[in-house]
């Protein structure tokens, strides 16, 4: 009886072709998975906290509190979650830098170039941003409580959910001004 049921289900020869296709598919899937696992990832470079200030430097997660970086070119730098409290960045070039979630309380950024910089969630409490150029920057979720923004043009700058200079929270769709 079992043979009769087997022949009904798989035919006279037991349908070995279907079994072979299944095994081949499993082998191919295994090879593809192994190739994906062994392939290099597009991971960010390791932070170098001892690196000198330069364009593209990676100081993410480093402590640079109180650093004197007056007029330094830090364009395209990676400084995610970097401690820059009380740092002197007057006139520094931070164009295109990633300062997301950086701690910059009390820093001096007067006259700095922050065009296209990512300041998403950055702590900017008490920061001096006077005359800073911020076109194309993203300040959503940033904390600007007590910051000095004299002669700063925020036109087009996302400020959604940022904490404004006076402590109020900007509306999620705020751009250029805190609504």
What would you call each of these model-derived segments?
Residues 1-9:
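N-terminal intrinsically disordered, acidic low-complexity segments at the extreme N-terminus
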Residues 3, 33-37:
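Intrinsically disordered, low-complexity repeat tracts enriched in Gly/Pro/Ser/Thr and acidic residues
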Residues 11-17, 21, 37-179:
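Tandem repeat scaffolds
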Residues 25-32:
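Core hydrophobic alpha-helical transmembrane segments of single-pass membrane proteins
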């Amino acid at each position: 009886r079992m043979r009769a049921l087997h022949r009904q289900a798989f035919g006279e020869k037991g349908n070995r072709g279907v079994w072979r296709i299944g095994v081949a598919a499993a082998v191919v899937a295994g090879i593809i998975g192994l190739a994906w696992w062994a392939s290099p990832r597009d991971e960010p470079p390791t932070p170098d906290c001892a690196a000198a200030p330069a364009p593209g430097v990676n100081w993410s997660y480093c402590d640079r509190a109180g650093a004197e970086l007056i007029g330094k070119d830090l364009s395209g730098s990676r400084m995610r979650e970097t401690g820059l409290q009380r740092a002197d960045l007057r006139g520094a070039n931070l164009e295109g830098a990633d300062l997301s979630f950086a701690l910059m309380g009390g820093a001096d950024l007067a006259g700095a170039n922050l065009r296209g910089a990512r300041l998403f969630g950055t702590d900017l409490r008490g920061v001096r941003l006077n005359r800073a150029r911020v076109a194309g920057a993203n300040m959503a979720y940033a904390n600007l409580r007590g910051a000095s923004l004299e002669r700063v043009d925020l036109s087009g700058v996302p400020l959604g959910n940022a904490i404004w200079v006076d402590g109020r929270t900007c509306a999620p769709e705020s751009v250029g001004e805190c609504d």
